[in-house]
């Protein structure tokens, strides 16, 4: 399993980038929209990586911060949430705002996230209620402001 990746940003796509390592190998890495927007072509970067192994593909999901990586991993423990849905959530909202929504048990807020209907939101609240500790809102951001700042929410097929 690949746990981290260090190299230069070779190219940028809508929902992914190619990171070329010192050995000359380029890895396609899918990332949350807001974090992908922080990258520039040619820049050096180190990403926290989740490696998803499927029958038909090995897919890398990358994160600039441990906070995003940890929430991605937590979301994958929820029944019915796979890597694409977790990436969609992280493309739409910052981790602190997501945790705040779970703590306040506001199902209406969670259903605004891409791919999250009422049943999935209820499952998120049920399965995360005892696993999410207290979180202070980032500089007083409301959930709506944090969703807007998080990204477009668009996730292309991997």
Give names to the regions the model predicted:
Residues 1-77:
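Structure-specific DNA junction-binding interface
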Residues 70-71, 85, 105-109, 154-158:
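A general alpha-helix detector
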Residues 64-67, 100-103, 149-156:
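Short acidic alpha-helix initiation/capping motifs at coil-to-helix transition points
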Residues 111-114, 124:
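Glycine- and Gly-Pro-enriched alpha-helical subdomains that act as flexible
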Residues 58-63, 83-102, 123-132:
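Amphipathic, charged-and-aliphatic alpha-helical interface segments
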Residues 127-158:
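Strongly charged, low-complexity linkers/loops
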Residues 120:
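Conserved Walker
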